[in-house]
């Protein structure tokens, strides 16, 4: 590629028709001239050959991806990150790259979108073996082609009649191994204690020892009994993650028998499959995060979790569970917040999804989570924090509600626990408050090279 060729892959962002492009932010490590590497990067993911032999045509103005910003983060790295790449004595340059990609190249189709922005041309571009997609921005014209969430945050709140606090979920545990009868009794107890939503674990499938039909039937009956006893709506969230050709059938069977929300693991099942199901769905859909960490965890390679969050929202998920705060989940606070923001921020006609940061939560982690997010528009999803409570799941759920009441009343957890044995038992079992707040492991804030806002994934 000559210097004159490079120019066709660079543009002033202000001069472009923003409705015709997606804007993509990448972290890139390259050898040699970073401008040449950036030009190759755009060429490979769009018009790798922009004219026919013997022709003076130029396909780049309409079809070429363009570099609109190139920032050098480190111009003299001794080698590529993670020991990737070899065979060149040229210094390695770390860059932040912003690209405008014409969405007419692939249209409003998620498999084709991912093939362009995360495909062969992106991750096998000459001289640039280290790549991480950090963010993606969609124009209104592109978003208008998608349904997005059917219910969204407002619709879910309306179904539950919960408008001024977080929505309280619980993962029924033991999550694997129980028959439907015992499993449904645990769910019933948790609803009586104050949970809004009792859910299947993401690994609980349609098995011979706990078949979906029987599970949905018994949990549906238990849900209705709990609604009659408490006077408030409840949701049973059934996991229908399965082969794509079974999704519609499993949706119908689960909903007919009593499930009033459905869990589908986004990446194992596929975003396009979820988008298909969204067109058929009668109830809210919830995403879980299996198979995302292998793409997202490395700081300088893969795809940022914020991008996965935006794609799940686009596909039609009403609720998106994501790795939450605390060291077990290997996410910085900033990255969790970035994902929550991606659920709630304006996105054209696409409704907001409810963010649910999860991982080892109990009554004592509710206050820190609420303060870090700065909004009541989130879901709180303990597992053992409810179902491993020493007084049982009804008391475990009650301890969550009592922790929220302490926040609203301006009390410490200790003060509230003096009047509530359920909360006192939770503190004794799971941890102790510190400095007037619930104990919660705090990952250190790190400004990462590729994405100070997103942190180390």
UniProtKB/Swiss-Prot annotation:
Cofactor info, note text: Binds 1 Mg(2+) ion per subunit.
Region named Disordered: 426-457
Residues with N6-carboxylysine modification: 199
Domain of life: Bacteria
BP term (GO), one: carbon fixation
Names of the cofactor(s): Mg(2+)
Entry-linked Gene3D superfamilies: Ribulose bisphosphate carboxylase, large subunit, C-terminal domain, RuBisCO large subunit, N-terminal domain
Keyword Metal-binding in annotation: yes
Alphabetized Pfam families for the sequence: RuBisCO_large
Listed InterPro entries: RuBisCO, RuBisCO_lsu_C, RuBisCO_lsu_C_sf, RuBisCO_lsu_N_sf
Keyword annotations of the record: Magnesium, Metal-binding
Gene Ontology molecular functions: magnesium ion binding; ribulose-bisphosphate carboxylase activity
Residues engaged in binding Mg(2+): 199, 201-202
Family to which this protein belongs: Belongs to the RuBisCO large chain family. Type IV subfamily.
Primary role: May be involved in sulfur metabolism and oxidative stress response. Does not show RuBisCO activity.
Protein name from the UniProt record: Ribulose bisphosphate carboxylase-like protein
